[in-house]
Amino acid sequence: MTTKRIAVTPGEPAGIGPDLVVQLAQQAWPAELVVCADPELLASRAKRLGLHVTFRPYLPDQAPRPQEAGTLTIAPFKLVTNTVCGQLDEQNSAYVVETLRYAGEKNMSGEFDAVVTGPVHKGIINQAGISFSGHTEFFAHQANCPDVVMMLATQGLQVALVTTHIPLAYVAKAITRQRLHHIIKILHADLISKFAITSPKIYVCGLNPHAGEDGHLGREEIDVIIPALNELRAEFQMNIVGPLPADTLFQPKYLQDADVVLAMYHDQGLPVLKSQGFGKSVNITLGLPYIRTSVDHGTALDLAGTGKADIGSFVCALNKAIELSSKN
């Protein structure tokens, strides 16, 4: 099997991202991990944590080779100003965004096989005057993808979302037949092309309690969700089950048969997933022309430089990126 080349962006330099990357370097990996970062930042963080890491330059003209324990392959970027653990500095926001831009470009060109992203701080990037609503939106805009899908995965459960980071008061209006068509088509296509699932089984949550109770607890199921699902079944022969009440759907008898659960909004699906696999789940962006996975946590500024950050989610994100890239 050909060795894959995975881009890794540590994210916010004052957060735990650099800590996690130098901790991950303590073990061997079956892919080449190209870390897009300032090597001085990583060296400083490794020293602070008492870890030994040897840096080697990224050589794009050479064939990728598995990452040896104790090493990191570096695509170098320079911080604008020195970073203090736990202290945000807007001067370094452009650095963070530039690492993402590079990783996205090289994935689109085929130089990299996937990208794994560490946590960023949206607030400090916007404070620097750079419009930034998140990794997902950044990569989607860069790749000219009008629609992408956020899916989180842990052992035995994958949950995709129809709506993501919007206020709960706006969710019902955001769920339209057109949006459901776009989301489910992307979900179905990527489960086939990236996950190698021949006929994906998609289980869909209702929006309202009891999936609307025949319209007595809301009409979104009757007016929007059921018609959209029926159209997709009829036109594309998709294997879709639902809409089912969310409190019913998240039971073993349904989950054991589902390749993915489609939740209508963020806090409908993700609490169940994080309860089942907190610290061991991974965020996957579907609909991009390449594989992108991410940790499921934030920058944890208070833990930066302490050695107390849990690498579990980053390990899962890397393993998932390697697994998916090996199928493509």
Swiss-Prot record:
Binds 1 divalent metal cation per subunit. Can use ions such as Zn(2+), Mg(2+) or Co(2+). A divalent metal cation binds at H165, H210, H266. Gene3D superfamilies: Isopropylmalate Dehydrogenase. Its EC number is 1.1.1.262. Keywords: Cobalt, Cytoplasm, Magnesium, Metal-binding, NAD, NADP, Oxidoreductase, Pyridoxine biosynthesis, Zinc. Signal peptide: none annotated. Pathway: Cofactor biosynthesis; pyridoxine 5'-phosphate biosynthesis; pyridoxine 5'-phosphate from D-erythrose 4-phosphate: step 4/5. Catalyzes the NAD(P)-dependent oxidation of 4-(phosphooxy)-L-threonine (HTP) into 2-amino-3-oxo-4-(phosphooxy)butyric acid which spontaneously decarboxylates to form 3-amino-2-oxopropyl phosphate (AHAP). Belongs to the PdxA family. The active site is located at the dimer interface. This is 4-hydroxythreonine-4-phosphate dehydrogenase. The gene is pdxA.
